[in-house]
């Protein structure tokens, strides 16, 4: 069987803070992704956790308001994996919410008494 013909599907199983993920069975997956991305782990950062269907494999990606879904899909494509439609839509909505929240944060009032 030619591996190029095998395509796996990734399903989003959770979006957690790094702190939550490090206190779960996903701890090692988060640490591996942080090492790959050369990223410092911060408790409040968010991670999207995907299960690769029909396997015991998980993939973790850091998510923030600047996350580009197309880049994430390219990362999966390198592994012969595609994101299922529903997971992609949920992730898009989540990122959009992060963008809205980030843009609507109240401006601090330095003139408070």
UniProtKB/Swiss-Prot annotation:
InterPro entries: DUF749, MTH1880, UCP005648_Ca-bd. It comes from the Archaea. Pfam families: DUF749. This is Uncharacterized protein MJ0858.
